[in-house]
From Swiss-Prot:
Organism: Nostoc sp. (strain PCC 7120 / SAG 25.82 / UTEX 2576)
Domains as described in the record: The J domain is necessary and sufficient to stimulate DnaK ATPase activity. Zinc center 1 plays an important role in the autonomous, DnaK-independent chaperone activity of DnaJ. Zinc center 2 is essential for interaction with DnaK and for DnaJ activity.
Name of the protein in question: Chaperone protein DnaJ
Family statement drawn from the similarity comment of this UniProt entry: Belongs to the DnaJ family.
UniProt keyword terms in alphabetical order: Chaperone, Cytoplasm, DNA replication, Metal-binding, Repeat, Stress response, Zinc, Zinc-finger
Binding site for Zn(2+) 2: 166, 169, 192, 195
Length: 376
């Protein structure tokens, strides 16, 4: 028993025309044979098309609602009616305008049968060291992509010959079969089996590319990494994707950047973050220290009385702003105070004198206060 057309599209029986169209778009995209290679997808796609043919037209829908499948048996929308219904032609153009993608990249522009087709975009993931991401620079990468065959100039035909127009479809890439019924004519359009939709037939294939018009080539490229890139930054390398078909333009290469962690530095936006350890005496008395930055060693002044976890700022020592490298973030250093667990006798004696001067109470458990742990 044939499935209910409303059930096939997943809509209610009182669904309006727009709801039916949206359901068809969603299902056609999911089950189109060029996208879904699972067993049964093609039959499901035909089933979806048939349901939409009937339910998208008020006349055939009314007959279906009244008489069921028998009322529309063999009926359909003729090819000449597509411009009036505003359905299949527009829907297929919008649904599949992004298909024909693939490779490492995402979708590319729509391929037109028999005409030039843009090559696929490609994706490459590239890891950078922390400082490479901060300052940028030139980087050499290796890619593998399709290039137009130099022997046949992309035609796929042996030099001295040329592809001929397909006699089966007259170069359209499609074949149509018209079925006439008491309810009207039904036109079924499918890909030409002779030329596989290209509209051309190659009788003498190029020996270099075996008729494909392209060859897989591995090559090295030098690319420029801008200063200030971060995880997920995407660089577009124009025309370094796969070669186009039948004279179409090549796709692009998209390089996605990922930054390795650094042992010393971290990053928060355009600020660099690190830690610095000082002794308790340096924290109390203050000092000058040499600290590491992404630019190299610089002098940092630790003020007297610096407290644990104080954040010191080195202005303009951070990451250049992407697209405006003159503007830079800051380097933020968290001060960690190193308090020893044991001290030598001479140091202990001096600290006990200091504790008495400060009025800190001493005892068996050690000093209470800032220096307490030193006397355990």
């Amino acid at each position: 028993m044939a499935r209910d057309y409303y059930e096939i599209l997943g809509v209610a029986r009182d669904a309006d025309k727009e709801e039916i169209k949206q359901a068809y778009r969603r299902l056609a995209r999911k089950y189109h044979p060029d996208v879904n290679k699972e067993p049964g997808a093609e039959e499901r796609f035909k089933e979806i098309n048939r349901a939409y043919e009937v339910l998208s037209e008020p006349e055939t829908r009314a007959r279906y609602d009244r008489f069921g499948p028998e009322g529309v048996s063999g009926a359909g929308v003729g090819f000449q009616d597509m411009s009036d219904m505003g359905g299949f032609a527009d829907i297929f153009e919008s649904i599949f305008s992004g298909f024909a993608g693939g490779g490492m990249g995402g979708p590319t522009q729509q391929r037109r049968r028999g005409g030039p087709a843009r090559g696929d975009d490609l994706r490459l993931d590239l890891k950078l060291d922390f400082r490479e991401a901060v300052f940028g620079g030139e980087k050499e990468i290796r890619i593998s992509h399709l290039e137009t065959c130099e022997t046949c100039s992309g035609s796929g035909a042996k030099p001295g010959t040329r592809p001929r127009t397909c006699s089966t479809c007259s170069g359209s890439g499609q074949v149509r079969r018209v079925t006439r019924t008491p309810f009207g004519s039904f036109t079924q359009v499918s890909t030409c089996p002779t030329c596989n939709g290209t509209g051309m037939v190659i009788e003498d294939k190029c020996d270099t590319c075996d008729g494909k018009g392209t060859n897989q080539v591995t090559k090295k490229l030098k690319i420029t990494i801008p200063a200030g890139v971060d995880n997920g930054t995407r660089l577009r390398i124009k025309d370094e994707g796969d070669a186009g078909q039948r004279g179409g333009p090549p796709g692009d290469l998209y390089v996605y950047l990922f930054v390795n962690e650094d042992e010393e530095f971290q990053r928060d936006g355009i600020n660099v973050i690190s830690e610095i350890k000082v002794s308790y005496l340096q924290a109390i008395l203050g000092c000058r220290l040499e600290v590491n930055t992404v630019d190299g060693p610089v002098e940092l002044i630790i003020p007297a009385g610096t407290q644990p976890n104080t954040v010191m700022k080195l202005e303009n020592r951070g990451v250049p702003r992407l697209g405006n490298p003159v503007s830079r973030g800051d380097h933020l250093l968290t001060v960690l105070i190193d308090i020893p667990t044991k001290v030598i006798p001479e140091e202990r004696e001096l600290l006990e004198k200091l504790a008495k001067i400060k009025g800190d109470r001493t005892g068996k458990g050690g000093l209470e206060g800032f220096l307490g742990n030193l006397f355990k």
